[in-house]
Amino acid sequence: MSKNFFMRVTLKLFAMLGDHLPAEMVGQRRAGNELTVDVPDGTSVQEVIDRFRLPSRLVHLVLVNGVTIPPHACGGHVLSADDEVAVWPPIGGG
């Protein structure tokens, strides 16, 4: 697929993952953990994760439009315009 056009997707980072947003983007966040970004057509979930330098050890659960994307499938899951990508770190407690 050509990467000559851009589409808008929403990225939601939960818990400490929000700390990985670049300082210049913090002002663009909505509702504290949500950021709308323009990405080239054909962008995969993994490319979005990589763009924000999210450490792989902290990327535990990824959903696109509420559907779980297994970690091994993030590189092959191509996003569409207006998709919502939600990322959670591992949950601890007891």
Model features per residue range: what roles?
Residues 1-93:
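Ubiquitin-like/PB1-type beta-grasp interaction modules and other compact soluble beta-rich domains
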